[in-house]
Amino acid sequence: MIYQTHYKISKIVDGDSIIVENIFNHKEIEIRLYGIDAPEAKRCSKLIQDERETHIAGEFLIELGLKATEFLRTIAPVGTDCTLIQEKDNTIDVYGRSLAYMILPTGEEINKLMIENGYAKPYEKSYCERLPEYQELNLVARTQRKGLYFYSEIF
């Protein structure tokens, strides 16, 4: 694992992407929250793919994506300090974003909080070390109809 400290959140992009800024050199990088997938908050090619896979209308998926984004803003507001943890073999996704687990000053992991509260699901198209834990947390959130599962059994 690679640990990187001295970052703060500068923008919430959507329910699974955050822009962080290095507090020393002010360089910004986009982080894809590793191992999780939240619905898209705007129309894009991934939304079309999700529509096909879930058989749910894009407009409804966007509503869910906006709810996930808003939840992320509440647990990790702009200006919050954070630590990034990356797996050595998986640091960048196909879009050039850095893959990371993000840790809040409280020690809580943002990725885990998103799944625990039902605002994201495990990203199962590629393996991450925490996937088994995320799958268990997702099952509990889904069973208890937390977060987005209140509105839909799948997303």
Question: Model regions: which residues?
Answer:
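Small beta-barrel nucleic-acid-binding modules, primarily SNase/OB-fold domains
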Residues: 1-155
